[in-house]
Structures are given as C-alpha cells and as structure tokens.
Amino acid sequence: MKFFAIAALFAGALAMPTTEIEARTDKAVCPSGLYSNLVCADVDVLGILCLHATSPSETPRDARHFQEICAKVGKQARCAVLPVAEQAVLCQRPAGVSA
C-alpha cells in the first residue's frame, strides 16, 4: 500500500510538464477571462447572442488578422463567453476591430 502511494506520487511528479503550456488564444485579440473564445459570427444580437458562430479557420496573429479571417467567410470577428452549437452567448467586438 505504501509502495503504491509513493509510486503514484513519483509518477505524478514525472508527468508534470516542464515547459509552460501556451494559451490557445492570443491575448492581443480577446481578453483573458470570460470573453476568451474567438468566434466568427454571422449576426451579433445586441452583444447577448451571436448566431452561426464558428471558430476561425486559422490562428489569428492580431485583431486585424482576426477580422480578415472572418471577413473571408462573410462573418464578423467576435470574442464570446460560451460558444455552443454554432451559437455564442455574450459576444463583444475585439479591441482593434472595426464594426
């Protein structure tokens, strides 16, 4: 029993990543916290709901690039709280993106 506990502790210590895990969102595009999900949406309903929201086809370098990626497919660049089933709850325009 003691051997198992010590072996599990040792295995857990070995399994910890040695380098920092990179964030999937660019902090320059969307703020960290609630509005951290990047989506391209057809319609933004008063910032409460974004319709037909999909993830961008590529990782944006900055806010302008994010806007260009979404514009290619005829959508608007938005930062959302909860994207579910092509709908995103609570959306806002990223800083540096024009309407």
UniProtKB/Swiss-Prot annotation:
GO terms for cellular component: extracellular region. Pfam families: Hydrophobin_2. It is found in: Secreted; Secreted, Cell wall; Vacuole; Cytoplasmic vesicle. Its main location: secreted. Coiled coil: none annotated. It comes from the Eukaryota. Disruption phenotype: Does not affect radial growth and multiple stress responses. Residues 1-15 form the signal peptide. Induction: Under normal conditions on SDAY medium (Sabouraud dextrose agar plus 1% yeast extract), the expression of hyd2B is increasingly down-regulated to a hardly detectable level on day 6. Hyd1A is the most active at transcription level under normal culture conditions, followed by hyd1B, hyd1E, hyd2A and hyd2C in order. Disulfide bonds join C30-C79, C40-C70. SUPFAM superfamilies: Hydrophobin II, HfbII (SSF101751). PANTHER family: HYDROPHOBIN (PTHR42341:SF1). Aerial growth, conidiation, and dispersal of filamentous fungi in the environment rely upon a capability of their secreting small amphipathic proteins called hydrophobins (HPBs) with low sequence identity. Class I can self-assemble into an outermost layer of rodlet bundles on aerial cell surfaces, conferring cellular hydrophobicity that supports fungal growth, development and dispersal; whereas Class II form highly ordered films at water-air interfaces through intermolecular interactions but contribute nothing to the rodlet structure. Belongs to the cerato-ulmin hydrophobin family. This is Class II hydrophobin B. It comes from Beauveria bassiana (strain ARSEF 2860).
